[in-house]
């Protein structure tokens, strides 16, 4: 892929969840027309990227299958690329196969809430293909993350996590990485 996000200023990422069970919008954008309208509104309001999520990571919620996630995300991605060809699209997924399918359909960025921990194929895929990547700090899974407490120097713990994961990506010569501290997740 070898695409690089050129963000000369702080960027705004508009969130478009296409799940029936999202903790932030409760399935308001499951309909393709509603999703496109919301995308248009976010772009008009200054969003630099549209982040499509098809798998809710709400605690104590069943995780969608890979097939369900693809069925939710791919049609919306294709429609956005058709209606707003200049829009930059990010895909919120922790699955390598979903990331790969979406990049093949034109997504420019992957936003991974697991920081590469849930799918061992994610970081190698991202690194080998130099795909812009949001690396989020995460402890546990959506079911268990709120059971953990970080003892000691929280800043150091988070920095060490980022360093480990970035080292993997950088071993492939990949440096287009955005760090997300995972507030509320990690």
Predicted regions and their residues:
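Alpha-helix-loop-beta-strand connector modules within alpha/beta enzyme cores
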Residues: 62-91, 97-100, 127-138
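Conserved, mostly hydrophobic/aromatic
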Residues: 16, 42, 46, 92, ...
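Glycine-rich, proline-tolerant flexible connector loops at the mouths of alpha/beta enzymes
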Residues: 22-24, 48-75, 183-186
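Glycine-rich anion/phosphate-binding loops
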Residues: 24-43, 68-72, 115-120, 155-163
């Amino acid at each position: 892929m070898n695409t690089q996000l050129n963000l000369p200023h702080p960027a705004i990422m508009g969130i478009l969840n296409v799940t029936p069970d999202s903790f932030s919008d409760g399935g308001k954008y499951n309909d393709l027309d509603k999703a496109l309208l919301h995308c248009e509104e976010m772009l008009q309001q200054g969003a630099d990227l549209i982040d499509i999520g098809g798998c809710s990571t709400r605690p104590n919620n069943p995780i969608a299958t890979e097939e369900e996630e693809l069925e939710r995300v791919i049609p919306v991605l294709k429609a956005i690329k058709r209606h707003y060809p200049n829009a930059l699209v990010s895909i919120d997924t922790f699955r390598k196969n979903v990331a790969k399918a979406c990049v093949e359909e034109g997504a420019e960025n992957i936003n991974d809430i697991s920081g590469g921990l849930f799918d061992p194929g994610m970081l190698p895929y991202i690194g080998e293909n130099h795909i812009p990547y949001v690396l989020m700090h995460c402890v546990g899974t959506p079911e268990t993350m709120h059971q953990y407490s970080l003892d000691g120097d929280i800043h150091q713990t988070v920095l060490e996590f980022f360093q480990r994961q970035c080292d993997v990506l950088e071993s492939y010569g990949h440096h287009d990485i955005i760090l997300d501290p995972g507030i509320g997740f990690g």
